[in-house]
């Protein structure tokens, strides 16, 4: 039985669910879950939690992501990416803008911005996913959502051809960010229809492309009994949270029993959640959170016995 976080390289054409389904067959275990959906046409890093690490999947999801995308100016689509039908076209020429214009424009997208999620997305409105409305040719009002663009920059020259302009960007962002919407919004700012024509996730939850294994590689390592060496411990998935190492055996026991504590027994500055780690074994003992009604106390959120 495997326990840990496995960064998978998801190839284009597979859904995230496909990856989990195939892994369950390869590893012969049902206790597997991914940490955030990647669209079928998107390749890249998909961290998968296995065994007891499934308990930290939410925290891996919260740790942020990085992407490399190709923005195509001059044509918009129904899905905001290359898979959709053409909505609008408008010829683009090198006299319309240059790379300095793009660089200045991208600066405006840094920080917390608002996005309207695409109709072809899994965001729910009135209990129904947006893509379900889209497939029935229905349109609904989509609420704006705030997303965090930690960094964005151009990483290629501008390529003007066949009345379109293509260039690559790298984006570091928080969860819930739609890169294809970012591409269309860049077009709007330039005064042109636009879409995202290619996307690769290069980092997710602290895992990067060089850490990631294809399904074929995973199958091979499993058959050689050497896959466990490629798994990251569940503690890795909690590195985005503050932590305290516990030496006292009596306190360890109280933590594992799920007892409440006064904040000043540890660090009175605990604002939200804290991870308790066994100083001897380096294993996580529990995740505690500030009590919702008694701010001076912390209570267990997850205990790892």
UniProtKB/Swiss-Prot annotation:
EC number of this enzyme: 5.4.99.25
SUPFAM superfamilies reported for this sequence: Pseudouridine synthase
Pfam assignment, any one: TruB_N
BP-aspect Gene Ontology terms: mRNA pseudouridine synthesis; tRNA pseudouridine synthesis
Swiss-Prot/TrEMBL catalytic activity: uridine(55) in tRNA = pseudouridine(55) in tRNA
Highest taxon of the lineage: Bacteria
Sorted UniProt keywords: Isomerase, tRNA processing
Group of enzyme by EC: isomerase
Segment forming the signal sequence: none
HAMAP family (UniProt xref): TruB_bact
Protein family per UniProt: Belongs to the pseudouridine synthase TruB family. Type 1 subfamily.
Xref: PANTHER family: PSEUDOURIDYLATE SYNTHASE TRUB1 (PTHR13767:SF2), TRNA-PSEUDOURIDINE SYNTHASE (PTHR13767)
Described function: Responsible for synthesis of pseudouridine from uracil-55 in the psi GC loop of transfer RNAs.
Annotated protein name in UniProt: tRNA pseudouridine synthase B
Organism annotation: Staphylococcus aureus (strain JH9)
Gene, per the UniProt record: truB
């Amino acid at each position: 039985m495997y326990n840990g976080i496995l960064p998978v390289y998801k190839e284009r054409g597979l859904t995230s669910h496909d990856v989990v389904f195939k892994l369950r067959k390869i590893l012969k275990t049902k206790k597997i879950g991914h940490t955030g959906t990647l669209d079928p046409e998107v390749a890249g890093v998909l961290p998968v939690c296995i065994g007891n690490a499934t308990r930290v999947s939410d925290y891996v999801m919260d740790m942020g992501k990085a992407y490399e995308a190709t923005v195509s100016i001059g044509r918009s689509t129904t899905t905001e990416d290359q898979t959709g039908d053409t909505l609008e076209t408008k010829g683009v020429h090198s006299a319309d803008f240059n790379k300095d214009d793009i660089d200045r424009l991208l600066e405006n997208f840094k920080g917390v911005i608002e996005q309207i999620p695409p109709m072809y997305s899994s965001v729910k409105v009135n209990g129904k996913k947006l893509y379900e409305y889209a497939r029935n040719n229905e349109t609904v009002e989509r609420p704006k959502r705030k997303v965090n663009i930690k960094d964005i920059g151009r990483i290629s020259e501008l390529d003007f051809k066949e009345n379109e302009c293509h260039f690559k960007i790298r984006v570091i962002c928080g969860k819930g960010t739609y890169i294809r919407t970012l591409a269309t919004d860049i077009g709007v700012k330039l005064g042109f229809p636009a879409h995202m024509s290619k996307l690769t996730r290069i980092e997710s939850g602290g895992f990067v492309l060089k850490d990631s294994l294809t399904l074929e590689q995973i199958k091979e390592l499993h058959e050689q009994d050497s896959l466990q060496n490629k798994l990251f411990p569940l503690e890795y998935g909690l590195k985005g949270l503050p932590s305290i190492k516990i030496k006292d055996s009596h306190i360890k026991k109280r933590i594992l029993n799920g007892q409440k504590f006064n904040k000043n027994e540890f660090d009175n500055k605990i604002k939200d959640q804290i991870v308790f780690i066994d100083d001897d074994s380096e294993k996580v003992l529990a995740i505690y959170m500030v009590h919702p009604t008694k701010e001076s106390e912390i209570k267990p959120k997850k205990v790892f016995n």
